[in-house]
């Protein structure tokens, strides 16, 4: 490949892009043409259109935002500021107040804002989120997914349920013992048989 200098654009009726080139070396090759034409049609138009559509779509834009960016606050924000930002956005994107032609878009945005608020308003979940965010993990929204923060809530509820069931079974046992003291031997045997079957 040869290097050329002093390229200039020449315009004709058929092709707007012709380049007249002069070789740098003193030897002028005879096989290299002095003009090069480029097609007038480019394939970049579809890329530009796609790019513009992506940037014009606020729902697609919000998928790439962190929860802080979604609420429009900084990472050093306080809880009252998070609540205030959430209330403003919830009023703006609530499905009941959305234009009829943008209900789906507003609903998606409202759900994202709700998830951001739930995560950032809970101190434990916020610490986990901040840690993961500082490590560069991506948080793309997938709609009420079971993420790590939700999993912790589920675990807490299951622990609470296990404690509650233990207490309930203890109360039943004491109640049965109290009833057993006032029942006859035959009544206690019938009751045991019913419980075992």
Swiss-Prot record:
Residues 66-133 form the J domain. Pfam families: DnaJ (PF00226). GO terms for cellular component: chloroplast; nucleus. Gene3D superfamilies: DnaJ domain. One of its GO terms (biological process) is regulation of isopentenyl diphosphate biosynthetic process, methylerythritol 4-phosphate pathway. Light-grown seedlings. The keyword Transit peptide applies. Keywords: Chaperone, Chloroplast, Plastid, Transit peptide. SUPFAM superfamilies: Chaperone J-domain. Residues 1-60 form a transit peptide. Signal peptide: none annotated. Induction: Down-regulated by mechanical and gravity stimulations. It is found in: Plastid, Chloroplast. Residues 169-197 are annotated as: Disordered. Plays a continuous role in plant development probably in the structural organization of compartments. Belongs to the DnaJ family. C/III subfamily. This is Chaperone protein dnaJ 20, chloroplastic. It comes from Arabidopsis thaliana.
